[in-house]
């Protein structure tokens, strides 16, 4: 059964970018998932199709009204039920939500479907959140104009985890954050670019050495850029093998930095 995304949004056309392009476009064409949009304006209570109003207590901006959203979510959940979806959640994309990470993406991908609620304006009537929303999710500590872009990020991340979505079944497993490690660097042709050659080991054909180098680079990059991930993966400290690889990475890095300093000094002397 395909994964079911039902999106509550005032801008349904935005999601054509998901269903028509790239990995998510191919997965949609292969019926690995289905995406339905529900426009709250179709549930508005007047002929102006009004879905927002001024906030009680005063203040700037407008607030999305509960009733049109409530009806849209109810219909979305009913449609999922008719299609056999038994495990689903209503997720509100909100800067107040828990930060989306790989663990959460995997949890969502194990469901049969989700209803994604995209807010606009100053926010959504709190009573709707209390009655209908199971979980709030944020894609970062910043504010964007609406929940649509955040919903598309979540959809893309979840679709990548669906069996058959990626051409190479190893791809999702090697992505950064999959194993609490950042991904190793990638290289392709030409062999030399602006006097910078591809690391010699990648041309050796020795797969065991290549895998070791890639693990070394993953550990080293994580140590440099996201040490918090290393602490999370190894709360009691690095195992001996990983510790050895990290020391090798540090030595290589220090050597590169030292050579660069020497080159800069020579240029200044000239």
Swiss-Prot record:
CDD domains: TrmD-like (cd18080)
Gene Ontology biological-process entries: tRNA N1-guanine methylation
SUPFAM superfamilies for the chain: alpha/beta knot (SSF75217)
Any Pfam family matching the protein: tRNA_m1G_MT
Subcellular locations according to the entry: Cytoplasm
Catalytic activity: guanosine(37) in tRNA + S-adenosyl-L-methionine = N(1)-methylguanosine(37) in tRNA + S-adenosyl-L-homocysteine + H(+)
Class of the enzyme per the UniProt entry, highest EC level: transferase
Primary residence: cytoplasm
Enzyme Commission no: 2.1.1.228
GO terms for MF: tRNA (guanine(37)-N1)-methyltransferase activity
UniProt keyword terms in alphabetical order: Cytoplasm, Methyltransferase, S-adenosyl-L-methionine, Transferase, tRNA processing
Gene3D superfamilies given in the database record: 3.40.1280.10, tRNA(m1g37)methyltransferase, domain 2
Domain of life: Bacteria
InterPro entries per UniProt: Alpha/beta_knot_MTases, tRNA_m1G_MeTrfase_C_sf, tRNA_m1G_MeTrfase_TrmD, tRNA_m1G_MTases_N, tRNA_MeTrfase_TRMD/TRM10
Cellular component annotations (GO), alphabetically ordered: cytosol
Family, as annotated: Belongs to the RNA methyltransferase TrmD family.
Function summary: Specifically methylates guanosine-37 in various tRNAs.
PANTHER family: TRNA (GUANINE-N(1)-)-METHYLTRANSFERASE (PTHR46417:SF1)
Oligomer status and interactors: Homodimer.
HAMAP family: TrmD
Protein name in the entry: tRNA (guanine-N(1)-)-methyltransferase
Source organism of the structure: Nitrosomonas europaea (strain ATCC 19718 / CIP 103999 / KCTC 2705 / NBRC 14298)
């Amino acid at each position: 059964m395909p994964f079911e995304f039902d999106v509550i949004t005032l801008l349904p056309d935005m999601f054509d970018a998901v269903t028509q392009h790239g990995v998510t476009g191919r997965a949609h064409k292969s019926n690995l998932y289905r995406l339905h949009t529900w426009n709250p304006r179709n549930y508005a209570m007047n002929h102006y199709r009004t879905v927002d109003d001024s906030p009680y207590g005063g203040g700037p901006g407008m607030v999305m009204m509960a009733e049109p959203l409530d009806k849209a979510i109810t219909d979305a959940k009913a449609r999922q039920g008719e299609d056999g979806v038994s495990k689903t959640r209503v997720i509100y994309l909100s800067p107040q939500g828990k930060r989306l990470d790989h663990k959460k993406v995997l949890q969502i991908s194990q469901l049969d479907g989700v209803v994604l609620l995209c807010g606009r304006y100053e926010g959504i009537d709190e009573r709707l959140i209390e009655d209908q929303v199971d979980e709030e999710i944020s894609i970062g500590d910043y504010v964007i104009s609406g929940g649509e872009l955040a919903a598309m990020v979540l959809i893309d991340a979840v679709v990548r985890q669906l069996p058959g979505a990626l051409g190479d079944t190893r791809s999702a497993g090697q992505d950064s954050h999959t194993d609490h490690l950042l991904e190793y660097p990638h290289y392709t042709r030409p062999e030399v670019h602006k006097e910078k050659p591809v690391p010699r080991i990648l041309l050796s054909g020795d797969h065991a050495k290549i895998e070791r180098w890639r693990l070394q680079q993953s550990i080293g990059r994580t140590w440099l850029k996201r040490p918090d991930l290393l602490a999370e993966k190894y709360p009691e400290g690095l195992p001996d093998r990983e510790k050895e690889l990290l020391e090798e990475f540090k030595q290589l890095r220090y050597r590169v930095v030292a050579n660069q300093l020497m080159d800069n000094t020579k240029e200044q002397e000239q």
